Amino acid sequence: MITRLFENDKQLEGFFSSLDKKKKYLLALSGGSDSLFLMYLLKSRAIFFTAVHVDYGWRETSYQEASDLAALCEQEQIPFILDRPEATDPMDSRDIENAARRYRYELFYRLCKEKCFSGVFLGHHADDQAETILKRVFEGAHLGNLKGMSAQVMYRDVALLRPLLHIPKHKIVEALDSHQVQYVQDITNCNERFLRARMRERLFPYLQDVFGKNIRDPLLSLAGDSAELREYLDQQTAPFLLRVVDNERGKLLPIEQELLKTSFLAKWVCKQFFLNERLVASKSFLQTVYDHLMTGSTARLRLRNRTVLVKARGVIIESIY
């Protein structure tokens, strides 16, 4: 079996040893190399799962590909669910990439709730992870938010499971090719109308040509450093957030002068305080809050639909009446 090539992979061993094999799961099966490899991997690890395939009808071949996947799953004795949303031309919308993703995740969530699946396996690999990290760098993400995708994360209250994040794409393809396993070549993955495709087809090859080396591993290393930084920041932040109290105006975060000596941590504490109230603060907003705290001046600021009151010794998110 093709996945025997990875039977000594310690990260995979650790991942699967943490799973409850008595439960049943979903596998997002596109038919591409990544999800197909993951299908065989799950079979080899005795995971009980159902494959779900979403056929958007974007390609002339997609109907036949869905039928072929159904036949393959029947041959492999894997339960199979086929979903065909209302057809949409991928060229008609600038946001079709994100819209399709939202549709899939809502479908996965609904299936998990209706059929009692414990989580969804996704075939994201190391190259996908590197793309995610570089995209976040260019978007100006906080250093603590450059960790990329997590191997296990909750989507609402459904687990998203990504065991392949450390495995490069080429190793997955080599494993399938060496065993003559056919997989779908999705041409939309190369359609440069989509940002991910432009990064994959143009940006990454260009950067690797300029630097003369693979840039995936340094990006993954950056993600690891970011994850460690995030863990440290969360540990340092927790005691300050425990001091949050309700007063006559709303939620109050007391700020001590000692905290203000470390601007990086002070702004992170404020950022998490706002997030706990479902408010996303920009870097410029956090800097403004910090500046007022440092000078001891009072300010009333707007953050989405809420009023934030900054005073000499604290930050208040005012209640909505």
Swiss-Prot record:
InterPro entries per UniProt: Rossmann-like_a/b/a_fold (IPR014729), TilS/TtcA_N (IPR011063), tRNA_Ile_lys_synt (IPR012094), tRNA_Ile_lys_synt_N (IPR012795)
Compartment(s): Cytoplasm
Pfam families: ATP_bind_3
GO cellular component, one term: cytoplasm
Reactions listed under catalytic activity: cytidine(34) in tRNA(Ile2) + L-lysine + ATP = lysidine(34) in tRNA(Ile2) + AMP + diphosphate + H(+)
Enzyme class: ligase
GO molecular function: ATP binding; tRNA(Ile)-lysidine synthase activity
Residues reported in the UniProt entry to bind ATP: 30-35
GO biological process, one term: tRNA modification
The enzyme's E.C. designation: 6.3.4.19
SUPFAM superfamilies associated with the record: Adenine nucleotide alpha hydrolases-like
Keyword terms: ATP-binding, Cytoplasm, Ligase, Nucleotide-binding, tRNA processing
Family according to the record: Belongs to the tRNA(Ile)-lysidine synthase family.
PANTHER family given in the database record: TRNA(ILE)-LYSIDINE SYNTHASE-RELATED (PTHR43033:SF1)
Role, per record: Ligates lysine onto the cytidine present at position 34 of the AUA codon-specific tRNA(Ile) that contains the anticodon CAU, in an ATP-dependent manner. Cytidine is converted to lysidine, thus changing the amino acid specificity of the tRNA from methionine to isoleucine.
Notes on the domains: The N-terminal region contains the highly conserved SGGXDS motif, predicted to be a P-loop motif involved in ATP binding.
Protein name per Swiss-Prot or TrEMBL: tRNA(Ile)-lysidine synthase
